[in-house]
Amino acid sequence: MDSTKEEEDLNNNIDEISDGENEEEELDEAIAAALQKIEVPSIPRRVKVYEMEDENWVDCGTGYCDGKIEGPLAYFIVRSEADNETILLKTQLIAEDIYSRQEETLIVWQELNGTDLALSFQESSGCIDMWMFLANVQKAISSVTRSYSNDDILTDEGALNENYLNTVDLPAPELANLKEIEEAVYGYMQSIQSRDSLVRYVSNENYIDRLIELFPLCEDLENTDDLHRLCSIIKSFVQLNDAPLLESLFSNDEKLMCVAGILEYDPEFPNIKANHREYLMDSKKFKQVVPIQDPRILAKIHQTFKLQYLRDVVVSRIVDEPSFSVLNSFIFFNQADIIQYLQTNEKFLHELFSIYVNEGEDDQRKQDGIFFIQQVCNIAKGLQFQSCSALFATFVKFNLLKALDYAMSHENNSVRNAGSDILVSIIDHEPAIVWQKFDQDRKDASSSLSNAHVSQHSLLSNLINILHKESNPGVLAQISEAFKMLLSLPGSYAYNNPYRNADGNVRNKTDNIIGINFIENFYDNSFNMLAAPLLELENVSSLDVKKLDMYMHLCELFCYFFRIHDYWSRRFDTYKTLTSKVALLLYSDRKYVVLSALRFIRSCLAARQSEMSLIMLETDTYGKVLDLMLKVKDQTNLVNSAALEFFEFLRSEGSEDTLDYLNKNYRPQLESLNNLSTFSELLNIIDGLSSDSRSPKTVGTHESNSYEFDGASNNNQRVGDDVSKDWEIQQDFSIENDTELSEKVGQRTVLDSIAPAELNIEDSCEQPKQPILEDRYFLESAVYDTSAESSGINVSNTRYSKRKSDFQVDDQQADDESPKKRLSIDSSSAQNGYAS
């Protein structure tokens, strides 16, 4: 009998164990299924791992943190940055509330075994990314474990405390219960599980609406304690970071205003009451230049304004990144709807921009219209690229540029600033939008002097007037940047690929052509106007700070034009005069002006040395730079460094004519700087030129036994007893042997820029076609390293480097090629695989 009873008990125990194991398996499967829905961070984040030892944080190494999900388990894994294999940390993420995010880059927690750990991220974005992964894992685990009430399993696993499973039950929303409600909410906020339960309870019971109804009564009774408690409760609800809950808080104007009123009574500042509602209800802040007839859009505009105020002022101290993201998403979708309405409502747009066509229109209304357009453009910049482009193109189509003519010529400084801000927003986004407008005007015009040219000249004239007269340094910088973008060759400013827009999509070839037309019109009608202050400059000492700021930006602009507008700048003798005038700015007592002038001279010289060097010799610019060097030789500042670098460039890259000029005209001044290594070496090179019968065209740090690719006669003279070896080197240095290397470097080989006759070898190879926007007049010293098997010589040595000007290559045909012609040629080349 006893034996039978023992057998039954044993079977019962086995059944219980089996049932428990089955429930554990079901729980694991459910958790695994929930975790599979979580998005794992796509980018490992750089992080330092710390462990607490003896009350001190010990650095355990630096690596890259990533999230990983394995079945029902989720982990933080940190791999060492040294080898990407050593695991510095692998910790299981659990649902218990043991994690905290501190400052912007720290995640700190205590493991179940009592070990304190911390992750210090290099960037706040990385910390947010991993924190969101952790929060999602905890929510997924909690949502599953709440549906299982087997206390034994939960206790054995140690995953959750049974208190987390208690059902949330708040006291009734009445004045008498506010203290109890505050304490209960505070308790539920302490764990992830209870916070989720609180969210569900508040949403299901319509608790917030019933609670908000108490606010007017509390204000009428002037019960400050209850108002403070009500504020604390609402702040806790906001911190739950639940999108539907926040949406219910701000779903309509009435409720939003109640929430703003409650948050005026912050218990952290008991003696101060904010005036949020007064600010939000001020109707003077809302102006309609053109009435908006759609009540739905009007409501969204008002709601967006209030949400922005709540985000930036009211709750900025109490919400974290997830809550900000929720508020930002509300604002973003509202703004997208508003922009869509404005973009598609032709009646509204026609009425708005017709204000600037009617001469008798009220000036105040025109000003308000400019500020309205500025706000719309600023909102559009935060939208997707395509939406923003569509809005800007629509505005330009409806004669936005006419409105900008008004704004940028206005006497009011704020109106001018708004107009320039609008223009910069558009051309910074995509200059082709403006180019296309002028091209369309040109096509529509019947007269020889097209409306496009007149309109463009008006726009550029306004920009030039602002640049010449504006006293605000910020606006000057903005207008200068606008010129660079508006007058950039397609692909030469900010984008590496000439056939790509800012969003990466393929640019229409037509956009490139109309961009070139725009630049041609600028040089025909506006270039001299822009350069006028520099061309008229006579005396620097009489200039005030405002004028000097303007000259600084002009130097930057013309430096940019000289380097980028190769085709046009070669045909303008103005640059000779400009260089002499810019050199006068070297005598200014303002360091930033001196640096701008020196940067112009140095950059232009590096871009096209042969031409710029002749200009500088004619205008004695070298002498003025030397005067500057003598002035600052004992100073320790950026001007000294920049001037010294200029002469270091001449030492290593200067032509024989330049050094001979310095020797004949400024020998004593150079000798006075002989204590500087740059000038002592420069003098040695000059002295070597006087006694060296070779007289190389390019002066550098040449050795006496160096080989030169200057022709057969020189080679025979210098190599002497090794002529055959020299011919072998020249023959090996061919297109075929250098194909792979030239592809890696992405430039033409040395032979591409040297006439075959000058190398005494036959032109047996077809010249490769060149990219359209390549600067054909500037070739840095070739940097090649041929293999020992092919030649046995390292051609990267500066002894074998040559600039195109040193070989006097006849490239007049390339000079005369217009960008449009080169664009057409390159388009066909691209089809054959040559275009970059």
Swiss-Prot record:
Residues 789-799, 825-836 have a biased composition (Polar residues). The keyword rRNA-binding does not apply. GO terms for biological process: DNA damage response; negative regulation of sister chromatid cohesion; regulation of double-strand break repair; signaling. It is found in: Nucleus. Keywords: Nucleus. The keyword Nucleus applies. Residues 1-25, 692-718, 789-836 are annotated as: Disordered. One of its GO terms (molecular function) is protein phosphatase activator activity. It comes from the Eukaryota. GO terms for cellular component: chromatin; nucleoplasm; nucleus; protein phosphatase 4 complex. This is Uncharacterized protein C216.01c.
